[in-house]
Amino acid sequence: ELLAKLQIDSKKVELVPVEHQLAHASSCYHLNESDEKTAILCLDSKGEYSNIFLGYGENGKIVRIKEFYNPDSLCGMYAALTDYLGFEILDGEFKVMGIAPFGDPDKYDLSELAKFNGKKFKVNNKLIGTVGLRRYKAKSKGHYFSKKLVEMLGPRRVGNLTDDPYVHYAAAIQKLYEDLTIELVEHFLGDVLDASGRLAISGTGSMNIRLNRMLKAHPRVKNLIVHPACGDPGTAIGAAAYVVRKEGKKLQPMKNVFLGPEYTTEQCIEACKLSRERPVWEVLEDPKERAVELLANGEIIAWFQGRMEFGPRSLGNRSILASPDEAEVSEKL
């Protein structure tokens, strides 16, 4: 049905399966391919097999160096603390990341949650990533951590995230996530980075911009490539790119992801007039100046311009903006 809408003859279509992490890897490598060898890191909650992929791309081919499998997941570790801090998994991670700078990462030691000893990366499943009867339960809901974690850290957050100890737990899990990722990259991808300095990353874990900043600042990384649609929707592009490249065809670099619809001022005004909510509208002479004024006064604004971006990131055309001055800004958003 979809193929018919796209005017593609289904009889001429061949279905080619591509592994989840390979699709992630392809999305960040094949669409930014270089003549130099490129280190590849994919951090994911879970795929059909692995959830951490470390490898490299060279001459259009992707080579695996190391993969880790559930329940040993960096994203799973972060998700468990997101759950403990009172947020929904796969939704609240950015709030934890956003509040982390307001805490002291060294006030509480969370290193018992996961360790890398130079060979093995292991998550402590007695504390997090638990399943079945070992899960901590409250109000008939099972959580992604155990009763032992609650005994170690105290009750799951129900109050203000900026309160002690929760704001410091947010800072500590962010630091642990960064430190373990850097250790894995240095151990498994160090030689590739020494050769070219190129690192391409994808997967839901690469939505963590604080981690990305750490990777970009790493002395061995000269060029950091982050696929804009680094979550699962981006694997559609990655899988297609993987198959095309496997056939020997080189792809054009992806210059941007502003691929969606755009609307004129007149269309926006007409939409306001037709809305039952009857929103008040005003045409501004200098929208940027007004936006700065509102942000400085602690307001939250929606920024809307040009074509809609593909993927989960606000890249400037469809963005919710707020000043990061206040510790409560994540809660407000």
What do these predicted ranges mean?
Residues L3-A25, Y29-E151, P155-N160, E186-V192, ...:
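Flexible beta->alpha loop and helix N-cap segments adjacent to enzyme active/binding sites
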Residues A171-S196:
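Phosphate/ATP-binding catalytic cores across multiple sugar-kinase/actin-like superfamilies
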Residues A172, S202, P324:
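A short glycine-/small-residue-rich loop at the edge of a beta-strand within enzyme catalytic domains
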Residues L81, T181, T204:
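Conserved hydrophobic/aromatic pocket- or pore-lining residues that grip, position, or stack substrates
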Residues E178, S202, G234-A236:
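Alpha-helical transmembrane segments that form the membrane-embedded catalytic/substrate-binding core
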